[in-house]
Structures are given as C-alpha cells and as structure tokens.
Regions:
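N-terminal FAD-binding dinucleotide-binding subdomain shared by FAD-dependent oxidases/monooxygenases
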Residues: 1-28, 43-44, 57, 72-207
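Short coil/turn connectors at secondary-structure junctions
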Residues: 49-50, 73
Length: 207
C-alpha cells in the first residue's frame, strides 16, 4: 500500500468499527441460525416461514424488525427499553433527483458546515413553550411528516428545557397510541426517557 508522512495522525474510524458481540448463557447452545446486525452476511437472508427472535430495539433492531416482520412466520421482539421511532421515509431516488443532488454537492456541503451537527436541517428558532397548543401541534406534524433526525429541530429547546422536551415526548407517544390498536402492546411501546438523549431511531412503518 501507499506510505504517508504527517505531523499528526487522527484515527477517525469511529466507535462502530467492530461489532459488540453479546455474551449470555445459552447463546452457544442455540441450535438455530444466529445473525448480528454488525456482521450481517453479504448474501440475502430469507426468513420466510421462520420463527425469529430479535434482541434489542435500538436503531439497528428497529430497522431489522420492520423488515423481518414482513417475512417471518412469527416474530418475537425482546425489548428492554422502548425507543422513539420517527419515520425515515426511505425510498428510491429518481434519476433526476440523483443528478440534481450530484450537481450541487459543493453547495450542500457548504450549507451543512453551517448547521448543528453537519446535517442540512434548519433549527426552528422558537421555544416549544412559547407557542399555543395548536401552533405546537402544527409545527410538530410538519416535522413528523418530514421524518428523519430533523424532527428534533422542530423547536430550539428540546435539548435544553425539561418541560419543552416533555411536550415533544407526549406528541410522539400520542402518535404511537394512534398507530397501534392493542392497548397492551401500546403500553410496551411507549418511551418515557428524554426525547433525543438517546440516538433517535428511524424506521419505515415500524409501528
């Protein structure tokens, strides 16, 4: 390979460069197939007709659950703590969209450098506590329907004011209550921790 000389070497491989393999009794005795989202096989995995268990409802778990549920005969989810899941609105990009994005790479990167976290999301300059209930819900609906991590930018104090955050939490919990029919399942899916204190999960029809 190539050899480089530099005054400083910054290793930016990140904390996710190696999979965190769980250790618990009985794992090695399991007779079925085991998969880890951090070491997913390159070839397709078919869960058709299978009984599947997924451990965990973090970002990777949420994305796996929604895909496996459409194939497996039966899916059991082992959850410790429910997550706030916002729609990702993943979809194939059309040729025109791709060409337009590629033609404006420089502008998009320049704009991202001026935003919080490097994402092309504009933070609302209003407090969640400064608006009426109608205005709050209107802004939150807009953010919800846009999807993605920009949801947290709906108001500027979700990350700084407890009461503002509670207002955002309850909005998401209401969305879950309306999406899930079974009251027992609803209660298991409702998160009560601070909105945004953990990585916001993005899903596609998760609820």
């Amino acid at each position: 390979g190539d050899v480089f000389s530099a005054q400083f070497c910054i290793m930016a491989s990140g904390c996710l460069s190696s999979a965190n393999m769980p250790k618990f009794d009985g794992l090695d005795d399991f007779a079925g197939r085991k998969f880890h989202t951090g070491r997913w096989p390159h070839e397709p995995v078919d869960f058709t007709g299978r009984r599947v268990g997924v451990i965990g409802t973090g970002s990777s778990g949420v994305q796996a659950i929604q895909e496996i549920a459409g194939q497996a005969e039966h899916l059991t989810v082992f959850q410790r703590t429910p997550s706030y899941v916002v729609e990702a609105f993943n979809r194939p990009l059309g040729d025109d969209e791709q060409r337009n994005i590629k033609a404006h790479y420089q502008e998009l990167r320049a704009a991202a450098k001026k935003t919080f976290g490097g994402f092309n999301t504009v933070m609302n300059d209003q407090s969640a506590l400064s608006v009426s209930e109608r205005e709050f819900r209107q802004r939150m609906e807009e953010a919800w329907n846009s999807g993605g991590i920009g949801f947290l930018a709906a108001f500027n104090d979700f990350g700084f004011h407890e009461e503002a955050n509670k207002r955002g939490q309850e909005f998401v919990r209401d969305k879950i209550r309306h999406a899930v029919d079974d009251p027992v399942t609803v209660e298991m899916l409702l998160p009560y921790h601070i909105l945004g204190c953990k990585r916001l999960c993005l899903g596609t029809n998760y609820y």
